[in-house]
Regions:
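Bacterial Sec-dependent N-terminal signal peptides
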Residues: 1-31
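Short linear sequence motifs
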Residues: 6-11, 19, 40, 134, ...
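Intrinsically disordered, low-complexity N-terminal regions enriched in serine/proline/glycine
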Residues: 9, 14, 140-143, 196, ...
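Mature N-terminal, pre-catalytic/accessory segment of carbohydrate-active enzymes
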Residues: 26-290
Length: 672
């Protein structure tokens, strides 16, 4: 049998792995054997159902080919259809679609192939059953300046001019679209990416803030024609008016029956209403063989503007932050002092963070858990701490080619004690049919180095047997399907992946350093957008000291995992080790942070007091993040810092704290 160069390299890798295992066996005086092969130790693939145009006769054939290629499972993702096959299209979650899904589950069970299902036809969550009330929102604003005795000379109104963005090539004019978007026929052909209708936006609130610190709610003084019936009293006044808009983001690459508005991810009722469609479709059906539901990244704001509002935001803000944001709108809009602007903006973004976790991720996971299932979630791109979003997921999933960013999902799997962390793998490596299996293996090895142990190829299109070569394709794929010339050798790559994943899944994480994922500095930064979106250590974290530390640790051979504020609060000390629910670490590293949450600093001091070594790179944070209204917390924060008595130990300065110590240096290697 002919083998390509990459397969020879696979064999060499396995030889080295066996050699290492042999050494371990000699050292520990016990025999190490290959763990049992299951469908989870094998690689899986994203399985696009283009147009949902699948047929039972073809399903039997292609699924057997997938099994023979040593794939362990399939993630069904309904997607846009192929031109010329419209007569085969089936609406997502329709009775006909459900019958095909049930048939697929039955066939997969016979072939021992696992099955996951995307919780949307495309991404993000959304569809034609999402009402305008449940669709993603945006906030617009206008500001005015008045002096004593003055009145506004213009009405308080905001007119959305409207626009339409397209994913396809069919010409569409905004004036030709009905409202709501679900009222339009043939959305599959229209391929809408974002729609905002031309209209006047409803007013949320109008406030007036004086230079003396007064704040007035003037909303009730707005007449039906928009006139503000108010004369400014003594002082200089800043008038802020907020308006609620429709963000307009559509489900990307949606298949038939899945086109429509994206949900409001910050609304509990929106996700509940959305998921009820699945409950209705599967009612009375046996979907017990389905393993996990899946979400293909956030990407709500891959659009014009941002989804940065929900109708209950002011009340939610007060619940989470403890003060009334309505009294601080100038700071939210960047019109107060730089310090106050940063603190209020941090609190606004942190509230968005909390709503995304509690109103979307947790409710979604609980919905799946009630069915005896779990969720796989790609959290990257979210306006929230992705480590906390990953922590809610049963299987956190990452993608990309940047090693230190890849470690975000596996880090959470390690610290939280999750068995699996997955990856969307080999996405768009090259142009169509230009990537070979050697390129794929290189991409997979990077994920393994980052700690991923559950590979999902990107991906495999269902293709009917009679479709002319090369069959049905997806635009951003390497094409892991039987029509690809490398298919004959694909099973050998999958054997390699299975062996690597068998040990990775069977092992226990043993990293030494917890790298504090400080996002408070970024969340406090003014910018041209109201939200910050996180994807590990790239994008807005490219210039951060956290990334600098991650790269330095990696280049110098230190094993590390990232940890969030919330996750750090759950740690404790055992035998001078910092213990998380899933692993134990020798130290926690905080990198050049300006701001830090009060609770995090308090926890770091407590860990040191109980025997831990906590190290700070390039200084200790001197300020707390957000609007801290408690004088007690402010005083205690200062006391914690003032109590540190540092003494030089070479390139490192250390201060004893109880049974442990706090160390700082400008040299990471010295701190290690």
């Amino acid at each position: 049998m002919k083998q390509s160069l990459f397969l020879k390299k696979c064999s060499k890798f396995c030889y080295v792995l066996f050699a290492v295992c042999g050494c371990l066996a000699c050292t520990q005086n016990q025999k190490i054997e290959w763990p049992q092969v299951t469908n989870e130790t094998k690689p899986w693939t994203r399985w696009w159902w283009e147009g949902n145009a699948v047929r039972t006769t073809d399903l039997d054939t292609v699924m057997r080919k997938y099994q023979e290629a040593n794939l362990g499972g399939l993630e069904i993702t309904p997607i846009y259809g192929i031109h010329g096959y419209e007569d085969r299209f089936k609406d997502f979650l329709s009775p006909e679609w459900v019958d095909l899904f049930l048939y697929t589950l039955q066939e997969a069970k016979q072939l021992a192939l696992g099955i996951d299902l995307a919780n949307a036809s495309g991404w993000p969550f959304g569809g034609p059953w999402v009402t305008p009330e449940d669709a993603c929102k945006t906030v617009a604003y206008k500001t005015y300046q008045l002096k004593e005795g003055e009145q506004l000379s213009e009405p308080v109104r905001y007119k959305e001019e409207g626009f339409v963005r397209l994913a396809g090539h069919t010409p569409v004019k905004l004036a030709d679209l009905k409202e709501p978007v679900s009222a339009n026929a043939d959305l599959q052909t229209l391929a809408l990416d974002q729609v905002r209708y031309k209209k006047e936006l409803p007013l949320i609130i109008v406030t007036a803030n004086s230079d003396k610190g007064e704040c007035l709610d003037l909303t009730s003084k707005i007449k039906p024609d928009g006139t503000l019936d108010w004369t400014a009293p003594q002082g200089d006044w800043t008038i802020c008016a907020l308006f609620q808009g429709h963000h307009g983001k559509m489900v990307e690459r949606a298949g038939p029956g899945g086109e429509g508005d994206v949900i409001d991810h910050f609304s509990a009722s929106a996700i509940d209403h959305y998921l009820s469609k699945f409950d209705e479709a599967f009612k009375g059906k046996d979907i017990s063989y389905l393993r996990y539901y899946f979400n293909d990244s956030y990407e709500v704001d891959d659009a014009r503007g941002e989804s940065n509002w929900t109708p209950a935001f002011f009340d939610e803000f007060q619940k989470y932050r403890g003060y009334d944001l309505r009294q601080h709108l100038p700071a939210l809009l960047g019109m107060d002092t730089p310090d106050k602007n940063a603190r209020v903006l941090y609190d606004y973004r942190q509230t968005i963070n909390d709503l995304l976790i509690n109103h979307y991720s947790i409710r979604w996971q609980h919905w799946a858990a009630k069915q005896g299932k779990g969720i796989r979630n790609q959290a990257h791109g979210s306006p929230a701490n992705i480590l906390d979003l990953y922590a809610v997921s049963d299987v956190p999933e990452i993608e990309g080619r940047d090693l230190v960013s890849i470690k975000a999902a596996p880090s959470v799997a390690h610290t939280e004690g999750k068995k699996l962390s997955s990856s969307e793998s080999a996405t768009w490596l090259d142009e169509h049919f230009q990537s070979n299996l050697g390129d794929v293996k290189k991409a997979l090895d990077l994920f393994f180095l980052g700690g991923v142990n559950h590979i999902f190829y990107h991906g495999t299109c269902f293709s009917p047997q009679e479709a002319p070569w090369p069959g049905w394709l997806f635009y951003a794929a390497v094409h892991f399907h039987p029509n690809n010339p490398f298919w004959e050798d694909f099973k050998y790559l999958n054997q390699y992946v299975t062996r690597v994943q068998s040990f990775l899944q069977d092992g226990t994480p043993d990293n030494d350093v917890l790298l504090y994922y400080n996002i408070a500095d970024v969340m406090s930064e003014q910018g041209n957008r109201s939200l910050q979106h996180f994807s590990g250590l790239d994008r807005n974290m490219l210039e951060s000291s956290v990334r600098e530390s991650a790269v330095t640790l990696t280049e110098n051979g230190y094993a590390w995992d990232m940890i969030s504020d919330k996750q750090l609060l759950k740690t404790n000390i055992e035998k001078e080790m910092i213990v998380t629910p899933g692993a134990a670490y020798k130290t926690v590293l905080v990198s050049a942070a300006q701001y830090i949450p009060y609770e995090t600093m308090e926890k770091l001091m407590a860990l040191a007091d109980e025997g831990a070594t906590v190290v700070f790179y390039k200084g200790i944070p001197q300020d707390m993040a957000g609007m801290i209204l408690s004088e007690e917390k402010q005083a205690h924060f200062k006391e914690m810092l003032d109590a540190l008595d540092f003494h030089a130990e070479g390139a490192v300065k250390c201060a004893r704290v109880g049974k442990g110590k706090i160390c700082l240096s400008d040299d990471i290697n010295a701190l290690m």
